[in-house]
Amino acid sequence: QHERIVTLANGYALTKREREILQYLSLGYGSVYISKTLFISDNTARTHIRNIYRKLDVSSREELLSLVNGMK
């Protein structure tokens, strides 16, 4: 799954931080956990998540996970 995330990150021009957050999202973690783990505000985590969704052209966690798991 890590390789798929790296491929997506490179293909969709995700930043290093967005790639890091995508990894957590793919493991099922939400913005609160991510913000505490990465020592950023919840609002910042949510902004990164919105940017990831926009760049990957997905609108839900389900779509995101399908893309990460190679089903889209």
Region locations from a protein language model:
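Cytosolic histidine kinase catalytic core of two-component systems
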Residues: 16-17, 59
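Conserved catalytic core of two-component sensor histidine kinases
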Residues: 15, 22, 46
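A short, Lys/Arg-enriched amphipathic alpha-helix from helix-turn-helix/homeodomain DNA-binding modules
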Residues: 12, 19, 27
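Linker/hinge segments immediately adjacent to helix-turn-helix/homeobox DNA-binding domains
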Residues: 1-16, 32, 72
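Pre-recognition alpha-helix immediately N-terminal to the DNA-recognition helix
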Residues: 19-23, 63
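Recognition helix of helix-turn-helix DNA-binding domains
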Residues: 28-63
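Short helix-to-turn junction characteristic of helix-turn-helix DNA-binding domains
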Residues: 25-29, 68
